[in-house]
Amino acid sequence: AAFREVTARIKRALKIPVVASNRINTPELAEEILASGDADLVSMARPLLADPELVNKAAAGKPEAINTCIACNQACLDHAFGMKRVSCLVNPRACHETELEYARAAQKKRVAVVGAGMAGLACATVAAARGHDVTLFEASDSVGGQFRLAAVVPGKEEFRETIRYFGYELERTGVKLKLGQRASAADLVGFDEVVIATGVVPRVPRIPGIDHPKVLTYAQLLGEKRPVGERVAVIGAGGIGIDVCEYLLHEPNISLKDWCAEW
């Protein structure tokens, strides 16, 4: 609710209903804004792409079941601006509901999913919801994959919400989760289907000195909190490179006052 304060000021100056919008992505926040009198109505757009059942789940008293919008804009706004079909990074069924129909499986199978990043979590929970017996293997001690790294970048803290949501879905759908277990061929014997969802690894360029102790990958920086010096060179200006710069330059818990001053 980044513009809540502005909405409240407008409401105090007008005698007509005022609608609050922008980053109101949970029912609790929406209720708080309405109860405080800062707005008469609340507008939600992206949160309903992330979970079209948001209102129904809130009304049923199950906010933990909501797939929360993380404001990534990677399939909604950017697609809209590019004249493409809008969808959602955390809900790929958005605007594809008639094409991606998760019908009950005609035959129950034993399915192994290797890797508990976002792709593996989505695959495992959908397969289980369709009636399959699913086991999910993850080599590390927690689920989330690359989203765990993204969540430490200032401004991307809400990526943790997607990890939380899939934790709920794993339990709801009955997926058997094997943490700290790197799946071997022996582990996968007896399954009818095996899905490999082990994700990506950083691409290390062949540059003289790349093996120097001061050279880090983004995973070592964000995931292991490796220390860096005062002057840092970042190789790669894609999304991850920008995130690394944001991580190095900004405090993770910026105040609303400082945020407003910056923007």
Which residues does each PLM region occupy?
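Short, electropositive alpha-helical surface patch
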Residues: 30-43, 187-197, 252
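A short helix-to-beta-strand connector/capping loop
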Residues: 38, 170-177, 211-215
